[in-house]
Amino acid sequence: MVVLVFGPALFLILISLGQCEHKFQTLPEYGDIGEYEFTNSEGDIISNETQKDKITLFTAIQTSCPEQCAIDIAKFNLLLYQDYRKNQKNMGHVKFVSIVTDSEGNPVNNLDEIIFTLNDIIQGFDPSIWNVVTGDPKQVYDIENNDINLYSATSDSSFAEKPYLETMLIVDKQNQLRLVRRGNQEGLIRDFKQHVALLQKQYDKAAAKVEENEE
């Protein structure tokens, strides 16, 4: 479980409203996401070990997509996936992991249906970039602050009354949680993308500093 260190009001902003202003130049670290293990459509294990040195973008995705999705799958595809798919030379370390659930948030073992759908609606769908996985979403969504737990929280305004199904996560190369953001609106997805870019700038700046010190 990740226990978030910011105050409850900010937690509610991040989880419930998903609003944020850029008042910092670096993304805060909220804690280690912990151990997790999923299985992708190729039968390969996706875990905290396989994702070392990668920026991992987590979502949940429903077998009812694209007709009924917790995240805006069309905007997620156009604003996020397509950009990173077309820029694998420089951004091949950014990976997508979508945990498949049914419309009620229960884990789904058979991935054939959703893989067929994504191949049909997502241009250039590539499982090596976008891992669609089976497993318990609680492994990464068990995020808590002041007795408010994202995985077990309920809200009448959320998909299936479960806010975590709408929530995107940024986990960095060291398995640290860096951002929690809803993914059901275009503006929030754009904001999420900006934070991924901000994290990448942090890595670029750190790498440049190391290179400078070695000269």
Where in this protein do the model-derived segments appear?
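Structural micro-motif
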Residues: S128-W130, Y141, N145-S155, E161-L169
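Thiol-/selenol-based redox modules, centered on thioredoxin-like
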Residues: S155-E215
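Short active-site neighborhood of thiol/selenol oxidoreductases, capturing the structured segment around
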Residues: N48-F76, K95-V100
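Structural microenvironment flanking redox-active thiols in thiol-disulfide oxidoreductases
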Residues: I73-I143
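Short loop/turn microsegments at loop-to-beta-strand junctions
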Residues: I33-G34, T56, L165-T167
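Hydrophobic alpha-helical segments, especially N-terminal targeting/anchoring helices
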Residues: T39-N40, V171
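N-terminal targeting signals for export/organelle localization
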Residues: M1-T39, E215
